[in-house]
Amino acid sequence: MTGSDSSSLAGPAPEGGGGGLHGGGAAASNGVANLSVSDLSGGESRAHLTSRITSADAVPIGDADPGADHGYHGELAAILIGDEALKAKIAVLAKAVAADHDQDTPPLLICVLKGAVMFVTDFARALPIPSELEFMAVTSYGSATTSSGVVRILKDLDRDITGRRVVIVEDIIDSGLTLSWLLRNLATRGPASVDVVALLRKPEAIKVDVDVRYVGFDIPNEFVVGYGLDYGERYRDLPFVGLLGEHMYR
């Protein structure tokens, strides 16, 4: 475990929160802004970027090309979002984020480990402006398939983010509990702004209203794996987002 003294925090994720944080807030005695919940209002949403995917869009794994299961024989039910669709969407998201940032002040991309590793790699390469990378690992899952609402930092940031324009890079938002907690945690560190770009979101699973500025796909409330997403540390290596067979987790 690395990072600051807050690298081993646990507790219920607070209700509420927003998907963006921009300036403002009361000044603390050390000159760093202490941003309250009311400051987490976020910027203008980019709802037009989001594509809606339904279960009907899934391609049964048996109908896909031979070898599409990448050796996970009988474990995957379907391909929900193929690799080409992922690449195209990431290009769109990168263009939108770049348009909202000044090239002279590179955004600091905070990748939420481990699930967002594939996404942040392709996203950073697709950005037409310079960026910097940081990594943070938080968990509220354990071995369960749904969020517990209890958040723990496994790896903290390796640098001070005071005055930085931060973009949190998330693989998936389901309950919103973990992201809400993370936004509040980062707000205490004095960034100039915080936005969130998420590849996937499950609207039906949301428990906390988190205003995420950039979302690639809204997907059904089913257990998905691939492209960084795992179940029991498996399936991260898949180049697509797929549906895990129910017999694998029930």
Per-region residue spans from a language model:
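PRPP-associated nucleotide enzymes
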Residues: 1-250
